Amino acid sequence: MKNQLRGPPVRAHMSTSGAAAAAAAGGTRAGSEPGAGSGSGAGIGAGATTGAGAMPCKSAEWLQEELEARGGASLLLLDCRPHELFESSHIETAINLAIPGLMLRRLRKGNLPIRSIIPNHADKERFATRCKAATVLLYDEATAEWQPEPGAPASVLGLLLQKLRDDGCQAYYLQGGFNKFQTEYSEHCETNVDSSSSPSGSPPTSVLGLGGLRISSDCSDGESDRELPSSATESDGSPVPSSQPAFPVQILPYLYLGCAKDSTNLDVLGKYGIKYILNVTPNLPNAFEHGGEFTYKQIPISDHWSQNLSQFFPEAISFIDEARSKKCGVLVHCLAGISRSVTVTVAYLMQKMNLSLNDAYDFVKRKKSNISPNFNFMGQLLDFERTLGLSSPCDNHAPSEQLYFSTPTNHNLFPINTLEST
């Protein structure tokens, strides 16, 4: 059970330049445009740019005054940090923006509405009704001063800010980000205390958040977009994280996600009641295939950008459902348990739980933190999402876009609580 705590007021001494910016910001209210400040400080503070070409920002002091004077009623706060950091602590009333890395290019091209990357339905509606009427303030972890450089990759914070302003919103970024605001005004920050959180007390990291990601304009196959340790690799080229769970991870009561080692451990298979094994590799043997105790299915796919894994989604989903109907556990594995088997597992959750790609991916990642499907597989999952009709209604796509998989049947959709209690 999570309890929301508000920290005691904490004040930190500001630098001379920071104090000047805050002082200039003090008289600038929500909705003011760049340069709207008064006196000698105009053009420096929260409602103004910090120089030619700089993006418009608001100060921590300005935000504190808005929250205390109006309770944030005239403000729409957007937190662009990873979801785990948002869950750990965030500014009151903020909405978190979380998105799989594959969607960043779509965001850059302008065909991904911002509303569609807000996971919570109530927050979607709040964004839709207030984004044009309120001052929109975005923040990341610690951006202090930001001036775009010509030709440099746009940060996601900058991309969102520019898109909002192009759409007619009064949008700004928070100078100094969350770190500065929490240091100076912790009473306006909400912290979730959860006994199951990181034992070290440090916030976990995520590959899904927007804050530190950058978007390249190249047309690479996506392999370079995977940020994994380089100390080890799969036999067919996929990086393998240095630390992995010792046993398969339970995704649903009957569905387990693991690696090749798990599939050869009789003690593990027996412990979890696993009788069905889905092997998502072209060359790893089915260790106990001839013993008659286990039911196998093998999907001959390598972890490579050229492979079409999505054509096997229907039969993989059917195989998992067969195990479920017989009240048996099913293990989905590849070599390392981070790419191919994850892709199949996410596809299953999307169809059977009626989850969007973003929600299904997040669901799996919360159970197994080291997942990293290759970029092409994520693209296939995105196409699968469209076929299932799970995309946001405001996320329109050109009719000429190609789908790269056999269309699965869209039936037998189960609510989350039904599947998790089975």
From Swiss-Prot:
GO cellular component assignments: cytosol
Keyword terms: Cytoplasm, Hydrolase, Protein phosphatase
Pfam families: DSPc, Rhodanese
Polar residues bias (residue ranges): 230-243
GO molecular function: MAP kinase tyrosine/serine/threonine phosphatase activity; protein serine/threonine phosphatase activity; protein tyrosine phosphatase activity
Compartments, as annotated in UniProt: Cytoplasm
Biased amino acid composition, Low complexity: 18-33
Entry keyword annotation includes Hydrolase: yes
Superkingdom field: Eukaryota
Region called Interaction with MAPK1, residue ranges: 105-106
Active site: C334
InterPro entries hit by this protein: Dual-sp_phosphatase_cat-dom, MKP, Prot-tyrosine_phosphatase-like, Rhodanese-like_dom, Rhodanese-like_dom_sf, Tyr_Pase_dom, TYR_PHOSPHATASE_DUAL_dom
Keyword Membrane listed: no
Activity: how regulated: Strongly inhibited by sodium orthovanadate.
Catalytic activity as recorded in UniProt: O-phospho-L-tyrosyl-[protein] + H2O = L-tyrosyl-[protein] + phosphate; O-phospho-L-seryl-[protein] + H2O = L-seryl-[protein] + phosphate; O-phospho-L-threonyl-[protein] + H2O = L-threonyl-[protein] + phosphate
Sequence ranges of Gly residues compositional bias: 34-43
Rhodanese domain residues: 71-190
Binding locations of substrate: C334, L335, A336, G337, I338, S339, R340
Known role: Dual specificity protein phosphatase. Shows high activity towards MAPK1/ERK2. Also has lower activity towards MAPK14 and MAPK8. In arrested oocytes, plays a role in meiotic resumption. Promotes nuclear envelope breakdown and activation of the CDK1/Cyclin-B complex in oocytes, probably by dephosphorylating and inactivating the conventional protein kinase C (cPKC) isozyme PRKCB. May also inactivate PRKCA and/or PRKCG.
Quaternary structure annotation from Swiss-Prot or TrEMBL: Interacts with MAPK1/ERK2; the interaction enhances DUSP7 phosphatase activity.
Similarity annotation: Belongs to the protein-tyrosine phosphatase family. Non-receptor class dual specificity subfamily.
Identification of the protein by name: Dual specificity protein phosphatase 7
Protein source organism: Mus musculus
